UniProtKB/Swiss-Prot annotation:
The chain crosses the membrane at residues 7-27, 44-64, 104-124. GO terms for cellular component: endoplasmic reticulum membrane. It is a multi-pass membrane protein. This is B-cell receptor-associated protein 29. The gene is BCAP29. Residues 1-6, 65-103 are lumenal. Its main location: endoplasmic reticulum. A motif (Di-lysine motif) lies at residues 237-240. Residues 166-233 form a coiled coil. Homodimer and heterodimer with BCAP31. Binds CASP8 as a complex containing BCAP31, BCAP29, BCL2 and/or BCL2L1. Interacts with VAMP3, VAMP1 and membrane IgD immunoglobulins. May interact with ACTG1 and non-muscle myosin II. It comes from the Eukaryota. Pfam families: Bap31 (PF05529), Bap31_Bap29_C (PF18035). It is found in: Endoplasmic reticulum membrane.
């Protein structure tokens, strides 16, 4: 195997190893996300994109070269012509065909696994972000549930307080209404007494007024009689 195909085979083995490591079930995507978030990857991001495209181009070139070699050595005309000139040519051609097919598989799978590896890294990163987002949403949902539970408990407590307060308020209102009814009855009684007293006072005033009028009339009569008596007494003295 030449140096270039040895490098491609090593690259293929490395790809298989990385894919197997990425597929290990006990390493969570968040751990890979932390590894991918190292600052060193940010520094080589531009070089990494260029290297990725360069490796794809090289693998495509090697794959096409391997396809050309396979087509070259798998031609029936070439095999028959070589076999006629030299007895060992058939075995030599078959060996080259085997190497060409091996190189074809190595380059083809290297190209395929390289694309798979890039896609796998992207999917792991997206999965880690989704899991992180899911964790945040779960935490928010738990907080919302706790807050809702707290609000429900507070609401129940307020309902109980309002219920108790309503009962106490009802008792207070009943007591106040009872007291107001008693005060009302007392005021009615006092008002009736005052009305009776006023009526009696008015009657007394009327009686006193009538008595005063009679006394005035009697007094006027007595004055007239007194005047008449004085006049008579004066006339009697003059006659004597």
């Amino acid at each position: 195997m030449t140096l270039q195909w040895t490098a491609v085979a090593t690259f293929l083995y490395a790809e298989i190893g990385l894919i197997l490591i990425f597929c290990l079930p006990f390493i969570p995507p968040q751990r890979w996300q932390k590894i991918f978030s190292f600052s060193v990857w940010g520094k080589i991001a531009s070089f990494w994109n260029k290297a990725f495209l360069t490796i794809i181009i090289l693998l495509i070139v090697l794959f096409l070269d391997a396809v050309r070699e396979v087509r070259k050595y798998s031609s029936t005309h070439t095999i028959e012509k070589s076999s006629a000139s030299r007895p060992a040519a058939y075995e030599h051609t078959q060996m080259k065909l085997f190497r060409s097919q091996r190189n074809l598989y190595i380059s083809g799978f290297s190209l395929f696994f390289w694309l798979v590896l890039r896609r796998l890294v992207t999917l792991i990163t997206q999965l880690a972000k989704e899991l992180s987002h899911k964790g945040v949403l779960k935490h928010q949902a738990e907080n919302i549930n706790q807050a809702a539970k707290k609000f429900m408990e507070e609401n129940e407590r307020l309902k109980r307080l309002l219920k108790n307060y309503g009962k106490e308020e009802e008792h207070i209102l009943e007591a106040e209404n009872k007291k107001l009814e008693e005060d009302k009855e007392k005021l009615k009684t006092e008002l009736k007494k005052a009305s009776d007293a006023l009526s009696k006072a008015q009657n007394d005033v009327m009686i006193m007024k009538m008595q005063s009028e009679r006394l005035s009339k009697e007094y006027d009569r007595l004055l007239r009689e007194h005047s008449e008596l004085q006049d008579r007494a004066g006339k009697d003295k003059k006659c004597l």
